Amino acid sequence: MKCSFHIPEKYQWASTLFVHVALIAGVAVYTVFGALSMQWLESPDRVRALLKRELKPVESLPPPPSISGLPDRITRVYLGEELAILDPGVHECLERTILTLFHDTKCDPYSFEHLNIELIDRCYAEANVPIPEGYGGQPRKKIKNKEEEKDVIDETPAEKWSIGNSVIFAFTVITTIGYGHVAPETFEGRLFLIFYGVIGVPFTLLTIADLGMFLTRFLKNLLTMARRFAHYLVKLYQKAKKQRNKSQKTSPVMPDSERSEVWNTGKEMKEMSMRTAREPGEGDEIEVIENGNDENGKEEDEEEPENNEPRKTEESIALGITFTCYLVAGAKILSVYEPEMDFFKALYFNFVTLTTIGLGDFVPKSFDYLLITLIYIGIGLALTTMAIEIAADLLKKLHYIGRKMENVGQAVVWFGGKKMTMKSLVKHLGDQFNIPEEELANFDMSAFVDNAIKVEKGEIATLRKPPTPPVVFRERAFSFSNVRNSSESALKYVDDNRFSKTTQPTIYTVIIHETTRTIDTLHNLADAIRRDPSIPRLDLDVHYLTDMSAPTSFDENYLRTYTNARRK
């Protein structure tokens, strides 16, 4: 037993809105999930533990070779990352030294060019690295108590996998931007990133495409409103110009009373002339249209721009203007709260990000406004999707120029969330209008689509066939004038004196014309039947005369009985 959940029609809009909101909320939750996961997988403690396992202990190093001519002192080169693991005080020294240099030089480019980095080298040279006594080194200085150890750890610089950097990393992964400012270093982090991207990239791109469709519809509505407003302004201008021309052509000013009388008289004469020239009811309608007072005409003129969809050129121009304004406005906003970006750098960052180039030379640093930055990037990616869609349509046109349409019947048409092939759609449409199956089987769909495109371009007026004369079903009585011979000059009635059995031996079908004599003739015929018992009785009940679907002028039963009697 199948259970189906039916949403009431009045709540359909709510379900559609819920789908859009759910997609956006899903991307947000997925981004936070990825950020927290990467922050845990790439935590400094786990990375240090892994690096310590990979590095060989100093005590396990072999003793120096006792070869003549070699120095007694052996030097081993450590990387900065290895020194930071062996002695966390290196970062403390570097941070303090760099801040001092910034303060002394005041960020002057010339001073930076001639900067002496001896102080920085001293931090590495004075690193407290445990070296065996056999190599001439000194043992590592131990921390006296836990409080001093806590102070050293708290004074270390901010970790690269902070919550802000983790969110930016997760968002740039699923949007395929990929700044590259941070990257996973552990096996677990890299493995998680693969599965995270496999699921998140399609889901996020689907959400961005859905948002792009919403923005496309919104942009089309704006274009339609702009076109309607322009049409309205043109009509106002034409109306004002027409009134100005009329005022210039009028005679000298007359009193208001005389002017109204002349106007009313002219209007009445026009109405009378129009009514005499046309059938009743037709003149009024035409006159109203001529006077420009047809309200339906106004509504059609106003609704006409709504029915015409914006052309691709208009969409392209509008999208280009919108995208440019969006870049400039975003650059102005980002330059306010991003410390490393001025207006041009913010504009450069927006372009590189929204086009998914993602060089990573500039990364958002203001984590307090990170939500605004991510929303801006998401809407910008939707605008980029719109541009890609328009460009794809243009490329399709260029690709199929000069090619003949093939396999039109298998083209898929989408109706909301359901799809149907063109062939099935035409078949169901033919069944709806009772078109014979032979015609549907012989229907050339490619030619039909080709002609329909020509109609849209204006090359063909219409695909409608010329109308055939309609079959008229007569609702009035069937008259003898429709069946009599051309040589017969007049109709013959039962009560007519010209009708004689001697001169007209043949039995004629007594058909009575639609005249005022019909009822009298029937009554006379009934009286004749009563006088002559040999003639069967003609039923003149009101039920027979009123309940027939179409009025008739003779009794078929009587005619059949009367004819058989004459033949005998």
Curated annotation (Swiss-Prot):
Task: Pull the Cytoplasmic topological domain ranges from the record.
Answer: 1-15, 212-316, 391-568
Annotated tissue distribution = Expressed in ray A-type neurons and cell bodies. Also seen in head, pharyngeal and phasmid neurons, and in coelomocytes.
At the top level of its lineage, which domain of life is listed? Eukaryota
Q: What UniProt keywords are attached to this protein's entry?
A: Ion channel, Ion transport, Membrane, Potassium, Potassium channel, Potassium transport, Transmembrane, Transmembrane helix, Transport
**Where is the protein localized?**
Membrane
4Fe-4S in keyword set = no
Listed Gene3D superfamilies: 1.10.287.70
Which residue spans traverse the membrane?
A: 16-36, 191-211, 317-337, 370-390
Q: Which GO terms label this protein's molecular function in UniProt?
A: outward rectifier potassium channel activity; potassium ion leak channel activity
Return the InterPro entries for the record. Answer: 2pore_dom_K_chnl, K_chnl_dom
One annotated GO biological process? potassium ion transmembrane transport
GO CC annotation: plasma membrane
Using the UniProt annotation, give all residue ranges assigned to the region (Disordered): 243-262, 274-314
Q: Which topology term describes how it sits in the membrane?
A: Multi-pass membrane protein
The annotated regions of Acidic residues compositional bias extend over 297-307
- Primary location: membrane
Per the entry, intramembrane positions are: 163-183, 343-363
The free-text function statement in the UniProt record for this protein reads:
Potassium channel protein that may be component of regulatory network that controls ray development and function.
Similarity section:
Belongs to the two pore domain potassium channel (TC 1.A.1.8) family.
> What's the protein called, per UniProt?
TWiK family of potassium channels protein 9
Its lineage opens with: Eukaryota, Metazoa, Ecdysozoa, Nematoda, Chromadorea
